[in-house]
Amino acid sequence: MSVVPPNRSQTGWPRGVNQFGNKYIQQTKPLTLERTINLYPLTNYTFGTKEPLYEKDSSVAARFQRMREEFDKIGMRRTVEGVLIVHEHRLPHVLLLQLGTTFFKLPGGELNPGEDEVEGLKRLMTEILGRQDGVLQDWVIDDCIGNWWRPNFEPPQYPYIPAHITKPKEHKKLFLVQLQEKALFAVPKNYKLVAAPLFELYDNAPGYGPIISSLPQLLSRFNFIYN
């Protein structure tokens, strides 16, 4: 190892150890914090049924027509969806609503104008999965795990706003909903609530669409505790 003599000029290369001064600050805390989420077995949860819950629009074309009309009146649509996770044999599973044989979606929906995102998601979760006996469900919502934008009145959505888009037509936010140790869910009769393992969702946009199939990556930052 070479050593710079004490009388040598410090203008050449390599320079002394003080070249960068305080440019690089010593990190006193880790750059990332470990976020721990408790998961409970699917068998801890009870699933009942309630009256059917129908979509506002009868077709995809009708949905985009209503979106266009509302955009002219109130601007961009805001949508929130909840990601509920359980485990089976220490493998994380996401609860999905299944309509028919091939359509899956996360519980959630449209926010009212000016409605708070978290409070709106709690309202929607109660409407979709809330129990019928009047006991209020305690939805714990702390983490936003994803943002998706719809640039036009068309099906494609992206996890970013395309560069040429100044007025997205819809903004969808995904939130992790932490479940209690035990709970009762009432599922609308026209839906099935299914538990899909992460390995089934991963890289499976043809089966579940781009948003649901991205959940394994979005959830990988959490440290799951299997109770």
From Swiss-Prot:
Modification Phosphotyrosine occurs at: Y40
Residues found modified as Omega-N-methylarginine: R15
Residues modified as N6-acetyllysine: K23, K29, K56
Entry's localization field: Nucleus; Cytoplasm
Keyword Nucleus: yes
Any one Gene Ontology molecular-function term assigned to this protein's record: identical protein binding
Occurrences of domain Nudix hydrolase (ranges): 76-201
Residues where N-acetylserine is found: S2
One Gene Ontology term, aspect cellular component: cytoplasm
Region (Interaction with RNA): 102-104
Induction record: Up-regulated during spermatogenesis.
Region annotated Necessary for interactions with PAPOLA and PABPN1, chain positions: 81-160
Keywords in alphabetical order: Acetylation, Cytoplasm, Differentiation, Methylation, mRNA processing, Nucleus, Phosphoprotein, RNA-binding
Annotated positions for site Interaction with RNA: E55, R63
Region feature Necessary for RNA-binding, mapped onto this chain: 2-147
Subunit structure comment from the entry: Homodimer (via N- and C-terminus); binds RNA as homodimer. Component of the cleavage factor Im (CFIm) complex which is a heterotetramer composed of two subunits of NUDT21/CPSF5 and two subunits of CPSF6 or CPSF7 or a heterodimer of CPSF6 and CPSF7. The cleavage factor Im (CFIm) complex associates with the CPSF and CSTF complexes to promote the assembly of the core mRNA 3'-processing machinery. Interacts with CPSF6 (via the RRM domain); this interaction is direct and enhances binding to RNA. Interacts with CPSF7. Interacts with FIP1L1; this interaction occurs in a RNA sequence-specific manner.
Protein name: Cleavage and polyadenylation specificity factor subunit 5
Source organism per UniProt: Mus musculus (Mouse)
